[in-house]
Amino acid sequence: MKHKLDVTINELRLKSIRKIVKRINTWSDEVKSYSDDALKQKTIEFKERLASGVDTLDTLLPEAYAVAREASWRVLGMYPKEVQLIGAIVLHEGNIAEMQTGEGKTLTATMPLYLNALSGKGTYLITTNDYLAKRDFEEMQPLYEWLGLTASLGFVDIVDYEYQKGEKRNIYEHDIIYTTNGRLGFDYLIDNLADSAEGKFLPQLNYGIIDEVDSIILDAAQTPLVISGAPRLQSNLFHIVKEFVDTLIEDVHFKMKKTKKEIWLLNQGIEAAQSYFNVEDLYSEQAMVLVRNINLALRAQYLFESNVDYFVYNGDIVLIDRITGRMLPGTKLQAGLHQAIEAKEGMEVSTDKSVMATITFQNLFKLFESFSGMTATGKLGESEFFDLYSKIVVQVPTDKAIQRIDEPDKVFRSVDEKNIAMIHDIVELHETGRPVLLITRTAEAAEYFSKVLFQMDIPNNLLIAQNVAKEAQMIAEAGQIGSMTVATSMAGRGTDIKLGEGVEALGGLAVIIHEHMENSRVDRQLRGRSGRQGDPGSSCIYISLDDYLVKRWSDSNLAENNQLYSLDAQRLSQSNLFNRKVKQIVVKAQRISEEQGVKAREMANEFEKSISIQRDLVYEERNRVLEIDDAENQDFKALAKDVFEMFVNEEKVLTKSRVVEYIYQNLSFQFNKDVACVNFKDKQAVVTFLLEQFEKQLALNRKNMQSAYYYNIFVQKVFLKAIDSCWLEQVDYLQQLKASVNQRQNGQRNAIFEYHRVALDSFEVMTRNIKKRMVKNICQSMITFDKEGMPVIHFP
């Protein structure tokens, strides 16, 4: 139900936007008379007006949108409607446009993409999967090219494709790029691992439009993109600890709060662990690896459920997105948790790899100069959009009134009774010829219903979010007469279901939903599969006390009331009191689920702040190194002096042997100078002596280079090596630290404070280590040349 104040605020926002729409319409009438050449020429004119400062993007908007609108009609045969103009204005303003399914978001996005591309700084359309990005790009590319702009898919759509040198740079030089959030995120991380200026390819992120924006920057906000590096030293405790955890009893040995994903040992559990593993103090420094593995095993055993949080598929653990139900192949839980789940399932434990680079979607999109988003369910997340990204949500009116009937929830005592009723209703609908879309939360439930329907001679298409392209085609056909489709909540998302001939007269598409999802936005998305563009249709959600939402988030004990099961099922389902009570339980459970989701995202955002700031500083330093173009005239004495002062201050007593050892380890392998003249009691004298050796070694290295060009490459490479090796250690350490702090004090403000304090201390240590390694690398690295005459650097 919409709050009156929300409606009023939205109308005020629309009122100012409609004034701009009027100006677009005026220009639209004018440009209709332009020849094709005259219309195309406007792009060149707009660029010149922007470059000269005569216009800004805002002042150009009405005329530019009118040009893009007319071009859409001439090239694509589609003429953007006024509601699409409203959405396009919201997108240019950097806000969230709530547009219902079937209202033409793909066409809407072309106008702000065209306008912002005129600046020459690049624009991006970011969606959730490769199929949708490729589909929308191929559909809209002719429009952009007709208007004189360049457009590209942000990736090569070939499995395991190996990019050639300069290929990605060529992609990102286009005016408009269609890509996915995952592809863009990994490209950002890879770009910042480049070892030369020529190896970088990603320009500054200027303007982006995110499709399904709530799914990407709210639901997936906590999911970090990770590039893995070398294997960590693997613990052999996973299977042993799993056997110990199997002996523990809840509320005797451990306590848990499933709603908060918290679990911890009680005193009896600590004593049991000390006895089982024969350790005196479980929380001693010597036993910390054991404690970590016990915590991981407890979380794997009790907080992660098979077929809910993950599948066992082809011998691998495949994670499931809890909100969307989509499988996440290739994604792994960090800090040993993935390996603990493998041990729980009796599988061979995979190698736990260190983290080389990581970023969350939340921080990725904050790198954009400006970004906006489209979704059918933005209003429900408006407070989060504003708190995290300073975005408002504007509800764009539909072109035609929504005719879909959203029926009241149907309430049942148990899942078995619910399933029987659902099958009965599906059979009745199918007999009328009405297309039916049955949506489940899990793939397991979808497979069950598909099998039952086949046994009842009702052919059906099963979609469980595995093959995106194939399922998009199948979901598009779900509106045909007599069609029966069984799908998980994410299968075929982003694809319109158009009604076949004769279906409108039957009442349109019937959407039957097996249970409420953990987030009401997803419920709305599922209902929105029916009733596109004013089509008739219906939706109904079936609920029971056995539903996952109730089991996971509700503290009600109604399901445990034995008297409930002595009553007649039909009479009970017709009881207003019972129906009202169960609905209240479900609504409360969903609200708790949503609140916990918000808190978890807030917590993730808090934890991410340290690594985000550190990442920005490190990447800035990398870029400064990559910009070195005259290494011969660079003065590295200040850097070396800092390092040598660290050395003399860290040593309690400076001796001749220690200083000579330091020189061999950090400055020169061939040092043979007599040091009798050095006063080792005078720290400044030692620093001066070390600086002399540093300058001699630097001069020798420069002499060994064939040219200033190769010396420049040498300096860049050895400095980057120092930065990268220290940063990789820091990133991996912060990942481990976050997991450790989370396990100890999940959800507490002091946990966040502790994390930031330790993260800052470790960053200061890292910056000192970078300087030390820079000095060591520039002195002790060697350069040779291969058969082709290319330089090869050998690091110490």
From Swiss-Prot:
SMART domains the record matches: SecA_DEAD, SecA_PP_bind
Q: Which CDD domains match?
A: DEXDc_SecA, SF2_C_secA
Q: Which GO terms describe its cellular component?
A: cell envelope Sec protein transport complex; cytoplasm; plasma membrane
Q: Write out the catalysed reaction.
A: ATP + H2O + cellular proteinSide 1 = ADP + phosphate + cellular proteinSide 2
One GO MF term: protein-exporting ATPase activity
Q: Where in the cell is it found?
A: Cell membrane; Cytoplasm
EC number(s) stated in the UniProt entry for this protein: 7.4.2.8
Specify the protein's topology with respect to the membrane: Peripheral membrane protein
Q: Which UniProt keywords apply?
A: ATP-binding, Cell membrane, Cytoplasm, Membrane, Nucleotide-binding, Protein transport, Translocase, Translocation, Transport
Keyword ATP-binding among UniProt keywords: yes
Mainly resides where? membrane
Q: Where does ATP bind?
A: 84, 102-106, 496
State what the entry records as the consequence of deleting this gene: No effect on cell growth, significantly reduces export of the cell wall protein SrpA. The small amount that is exported seems to be glycosylated normally.
Q: Does the keyword Cytoplasm apply?
A: yes
For this chain, the family text in UniProt reads: Belongs to the SecA family.
What functional role does this protein have?
A: Part of the accessory SecA2/SecY2 system specifically required to export SraP, a serine-rich repeat cell wall protein encoded upstream in the same operon.
Question: What's the subunit arrangement here?
Answer: Monomer and homodimer (Potential). Part of the accessory SecA2/SecY2 protein translocation apparatus required to export cell wall protein SraP.
Q: Quote the protein name from its UniProt record.
A: Protein translocase subunit SecA 2
Q: Give the classification, highest ranks.
A: Bacteria, Bacillati, Bacillota, Bacilli, Bacillales
